[in-house]
Design a protein with these regions (language model features):
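Thiamine diphosphate
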Residues: 1-165, 170, 181, ...
Length: 315
C-alpha cells in the first residue's frame, strides 16, 4: 500500500472538541485528570479555559463532576487514559453515569497495548468488556482520524452515555473525509470477498485491509468489515458477512475475552452458527516496549490475520 498520512486518534479527539466549541456549541465542556497534554484536550483548554476543568488525579470524582454537569444541561467530555477512565473509575461510571443514563461522553485515550513503553499498568485491554457490560452504554472505537472526528461529533449529537476509545499511536488515515458517512451502530464494508470475512475495529481495521490485499495476491478474497461501534453491534452486517463467506476472523486490540470477538460470536452462535477465530490479546497482560514491536509480538498485525485465514481455509 502507498504511504499515507498517519495521525493518532487522540489528536483527532482534541481537534474535534475545539472545532465543536468554535462552532458555537456552548453546552460542551471538557474535564481532564491532569493529562490534558497526553489526551490532547490541552488545545481546548488553551482556547476555552473557562470550559475546561482539570480534576486532578481523581478519576472517580471527575466522573461524578461530569454527571452533575450533565444534569444542568451541559454535555461533558470526560478525558483520561482508558486504564483510568474505564478501570479505576468503573464504579462511578456505572453508578453515577450509566445507572441514571446521563448525557456524559467519556474520551478514553491510550487504549490497548500500543501505549508502548508505559507497560502493562497503563495498557488497558479490558475496557470494551467493562464498558459493554454497562446497560445503555454506547461503545465506539474509531479506526483513523476521519472516523474519530466523525465519532466525536456523533457522540456529541446523541443523547446518553458514550465511551470513545482513542489511541496513542499515529495510524494511517485511509478514509476519504469528503465521502465518509458515520452512523453509530452501523458497520462499514471496506472490501468485497466471499472466501473469508475479517471483522475488525480500531487500528486493526487497517491491518485487516493490508491482510486482505496480501490474501488477494494469493487468490483468497477476504471481505473486510469495519466495526467502529462495539455496542450496539451492527448485527445485520455481521450476519451478512458470515452468510456470504462462511468463515469469520475478528481482529481487535483488546483481550479476546469480552471484546468485539465475543460480541460477534454471541450473535452468530444464536442466529447463524459460523466458524470464528479471534485475533486479539490472548488473555495476557501487556509489557513495555515500542508500540509496533508489541503489536507484532502479540499477534495484532496483518501477518497474524493472514496466518489465521490460511488455517481456517486449509491453505
Amino acid at each position: 500500500m502507498a504511504d499515507v498520512k498517519k495521525i493518532a486518534t487522540r489528536e483527532s479527539y482534541g481537534n474535534t472538541l475545539k472545532e465543536l466549541a468554535a462552532e458555537g456549541h456552548e453546552d460542551l465542556v471538557v474535564l481532564d485528570a491532569d493529562l490534558a497534554a497526553a489526551t490532547k484536550t490541552g488545545m481546548f483548554r488553551k482556547a476555552y479555559p473557562d470550559r475546561h476543568f482539570d480534576c486532578g488525579i481523581a478519576e472517580g470524582n471527575m466522573m461524578g463532576v461530569a454527571a452533575g454537569l450533565s444534569t444542568m444541561g451541559y454535555v461533558p467530555f470526560v478525558s483520561s487514559f482508558a486504564m483510568f477512565a474505564a478501570g479505576r473509575a468503573f464504579e462511578q461510571v456505572r453508578n453515577s453515569i450509566g445507572y441514571p443514563h446521563l448525557n456524559v461522553k467519556i474520551g478514553a485515550t491510550h487504549g490497548g497495548i500500543s501505549v508502548g513503553e508505559d507497560g502493562a499498568s497503563h495498557q488497558c485491554c479490558e475496557d470494551f468488556a467493562l464498558m459493554r457490560s454497562i446497560p445503555g452504554m454506547t461503545v465506539i472505537c474509531p479506526a483513523d482520524d476521519v472516523e474519530a472526528r466523525a465519532a466525536v461529533r456523533a457522540a456529541y449529537a446523541m443523547e446518553g452515555p458514550v465511551y470513545l476509545r482513542f489511541g496513542r499511536l499515529a495510524v494511517p488515515v485511509f478514509h476519504d473525509a469528503e465521502n465518509y458517512h458515520f452512523e453509530i451502530g452501523k458497520g462499514e464494508q471496506i472490501t468485497e470477498g466471499s472466501d473469508i470475512a475479517i471483522i475488525a475495529t480500531g487500528l486493526m481495521v487497517n491491518e485487516a485491509r493490508i491482510a486482505a490485499e496480501q490474501l488477494t495476491a494469493e487468490g483468497i478474497h477476504a471481505q473486510v468489515i469495519n466495526i467502529h461501534t462495539i455496542k450496539p453491534l451492527d448485527e445485520e452486517i455481521v450476519l451478512k458477512a458470515a452468510k456470504e463467506c462462511g468463515k469469520v476472523i475478528t481482529a481487535e486490540e483488546h483481550n479476546v475475552i469480552g471484546g468485539l470477538g465475543e460480541a460477534v460470536c454471541a450473535v452468530l452462535s444464536e442466529k447463524l452458527p459460523t466458524p470464528v477465530r479471534r485475533v486479539g490479546v490472548q488473555d495476557k497482560f501487556g509489557c513495555s516496549g515500542p508500540a509496533w514491536d508489541l503489536l507484532r509480538e502479540y499477534g495484532l498485525d496483518a501477518a497474524t490475520i493472514c496466518k489465521t485465514a490460511h488455517e481456517m481455509l486449509g491453505k
